[in-house]
């Protein structure tokens, strides 16, 4: 019985279409808890901030480099996680990530210098966070289609519940056993990533019929078309002057067309070529870097990262600097996390509605998030910080749970390139992940005012809004250029047309001065 259960969890799922459920619900639960033990811990790390400053006698900017290096490694190694996932499978990579995360956090609890934490949490755990998070969110997107936005949004609330629960719990635990043993406990707790990673069964989408049946059906359809084509074309040729002959083989699925000029006739040779899907897919597709819409979206992620992590790191020190006790300051972080839950779920429901331009909803949320970051600089007491925390938490939730799944939308790259796009996108975010927290810490060290840390966050988010606003125009501009280029090629006789979709090929059959001879040749 146990062996059957293990076999059930290990074999791949094969579907004829995107299931929008099935084992995907187990994957969604796994993603929830992976979020708990990855981003949930990263965002809760602010509770150790003052303890580390006192123990190592270091400045804000020096301590902030711990999370900065961690986020940098997390995002910088995203292409590596993509390659390993495509090569060895998502399950093994996530389980390896869980081991690395736990090892780094446990080693950090024995650190005697802040540089030791740079290696333990920054590099080792950072690499583990990437191996754990990215493959999980990628495979979750493959299990869901219509429900992708809402499922991802709800599952991503794991980090919010983690911050809500861990922030006060770790504060209480530190008072009893100290920050080192508390960090050790967190590291052992993160071993659960290995368990939930084991639930990530791979998914394969194939056609509803076997290849043999499809070939037979194609041959029957081709034969039927051949029998009826003579009658139809003989009638059409009276008006259009088109003469059509076809070979008795199955109709090709992918065509190359070549126009050869004649005295009063153009001959269109249609040759079959292998399906694109039969070619071996690259482990990492860098062709997405040629799409201007993706470049703009990646720049959006780059600048937005400046405002993602610093607020959660500095909200507790900011509250303490304003005379708020530690317990109430920790409650600010918990409140921010709960507001983020509602933001993620709300965004999921809104983006799940059809039809809707999801990129525009995201843009509105980014603008409001920029406003919330500026609002922190004007707060002077507990309830002002509470209001800002709720507003910020809700708005960051609308973006945090949707900015990666939004890559699967046609406005950006589409679901076919989702895996490679996610790896490159998070890789580009690494620059801001490295610079964000130290930049905020530098502003604090120079001014001795914690609210100044939010200026860099707000400035980065404002630039992110500008880049996001350019995504849709860039996509439309590319499409228009693509159409005009194809029209020019078709209009010139004697030119070679390669890899042109049939939908874009228009022939003027009304002209009698040209006769078109169509010949279909077998492979």
Curated annotation (Swiss-Prot):
Gene3D superfamilies attached to this UniProt entry: MFS general substrate transporter like domains (1.20.1250.20)
Annotated localization: Basolateral cell membrane
Catalytic activity: taurine(out) = taurine(in)
Modified residues annotated as Phosphoserine in this record: 234, 237, 240, 247
Record Pfam families: MFS_1 (PF07690)
UniProt keyword terms in alphabetical order: Cell membrane, Membrane, Phosphoprotein, Transmembrane, Transmembrane helix, Transport
Family matches, as SUPFAM superfamilies: MFS general substrate transporter
GO terms, biological process: monocarboxylic acid transport
Principal localisation: membrane
Transmembrane segments annotated in the record for this chain: 22-42, 63-83, 92-112, 119-139, 150-170, 185-205, 300-320, 331-351, 359-379, 382-402, 424-444, 453-473
GO molecular function: monocarboxylic acid transmembrane transporter activity; taurine transmembrane transporter activity
Protein topology in the membrane: Multi-pass membrane protein
Ranges facing Extracellular side: 43-62, 113-118, 171-184, 321-330, 380-381, 445-452
GO CC term, one of those recorded: plasma membrane
Cytoplasmic side: 1-21, 84-91, 140-149, 206-299, 352-358, 403-423, 474-523
UniProt superkingdom: Eukaryota
This protein's record includes keyword Transmembrane: yes
Function description: Monocarboxylate transporter selective for taurine. May associate with BSG/CD147 or EMB/GP70 ancillary proteins to mediate facilitative efflux or influx of taurine across the plasma membrane. The transport is pH- and sodium-independent. Rather low-affinity, is likely effective for taurine transport in tissues where taurine is present at high concentrations.
Recorded family membership: Belongs to the major facilitator superfamily. Monocarboxylate porter (TC 2.A.1.13) family.
Assembly notes: Forms functional complexes with BSG/CD147 or EMB/GP70 ancillary proteins.
Name by which UniProt lists this protein: Monocarboxylate transporter 7
Organism this protein belongs to: Homo sapiens
């Amino acid at each position: 019985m146990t062996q059957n259960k293990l076999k059930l969890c290990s074999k791949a799922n094969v579907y004829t279409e995107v299931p929008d459920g099935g084992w995907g619900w187990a994957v969604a639960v796994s993603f929830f808890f992976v979020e708990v033990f990855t981003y949930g811990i990263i965002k809760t790390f602010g509770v150790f901030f003052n303890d580390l400053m006192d123990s190592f006698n270091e400045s804000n900017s020096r301590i902030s480099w711990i999370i900065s290096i961690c986020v940098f490694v997390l995002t910088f190694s995203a292409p590596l996680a993509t390659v390993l996932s495509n090569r060895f499978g998502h399950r093994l990579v996530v389980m390896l990530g869980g081991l690395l995360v736990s090892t780094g956090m446990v080693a950090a609890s024995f650190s005697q210098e802040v540089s030791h934490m740079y290696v333990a949490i920054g590099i080792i755990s950072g690499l583990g966070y990437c191996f754990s998070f990215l493959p999980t969110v990628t495979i979750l997107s493959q299990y869901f289609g219509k429900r992708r936005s809402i499922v991802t949004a709800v599952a991503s609330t794991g980090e919010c519940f983690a911050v809500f629960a861990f922030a006060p719990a770790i504060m209480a635990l530190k008072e009893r056993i100290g920050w080192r043993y508390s960090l050790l406990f967190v590291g052992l707790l993160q071993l659960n990533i290995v368990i939930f990673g084991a639930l990530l069964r791979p998914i394969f989408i194939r056609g509803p019929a076997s290849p043999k049946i499809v070939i037979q059906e194609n041959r029957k359809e081709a034969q039927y078309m051949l029998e009826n084509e003579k009658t139809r074309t003989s009638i059409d040729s009276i008006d259009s002057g088109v003469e059509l002959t076809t070979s008795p083989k199955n109709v090709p699925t992918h065509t190359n067309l070549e126009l050869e000029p004649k005295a009063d006739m153009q001959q269109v040779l249609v040759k079959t070529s292998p399906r694109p899907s039969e070619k071996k897919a690259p482990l990492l597709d860098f062709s997405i870097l040629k799409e201007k819409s993706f470049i703009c979206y990646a720049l959006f992620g780059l600048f937005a990262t400046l405002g993602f992590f610093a607020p959660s790191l500095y909200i507790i020190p900011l509250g303490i600097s304003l005379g708020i006790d530690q317990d109430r300051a920790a409650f600010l972080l918990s409140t921010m996390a709960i507001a983020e839950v509602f933001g993620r779920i709300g965004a999921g429901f809104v983006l799940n509605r059809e039809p809707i331009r999801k990129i525009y909803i995201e843009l509105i949320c980014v603008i409001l998030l920029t406003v919330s970051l500026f609002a922190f600089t004007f707060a002077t007491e507990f309830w002002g910080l509470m209001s800002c925390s709720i507003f910020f938490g809700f708005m960051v939730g609308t973006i945090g749970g949707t900015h990666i799944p939004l890559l699967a939308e046609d406005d950006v790259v589409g679901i076919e390139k989702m895996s490679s796009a996610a790896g490159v996108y998070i890789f580009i975010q690494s620059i801001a992940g490295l610079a964000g927290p130290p930049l905020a810490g530098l502003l604090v060290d120079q001014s001795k005012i914690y609210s100044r840390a939010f200026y860099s966050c707000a400035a980065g988010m404002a630039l992110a809004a500008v880049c996001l606003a350019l995504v849709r125009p860039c996509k439309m501009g590319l499409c228009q250029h693509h159409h005009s280029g194809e029209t020019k090629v078709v209009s010139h006789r004697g030119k070679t047309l390669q890899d042109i979709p049939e939908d874009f090929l228009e022939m003027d059959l009304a002209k009698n001065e040209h006769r078109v001879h169509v010949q279909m040749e077998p492979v």
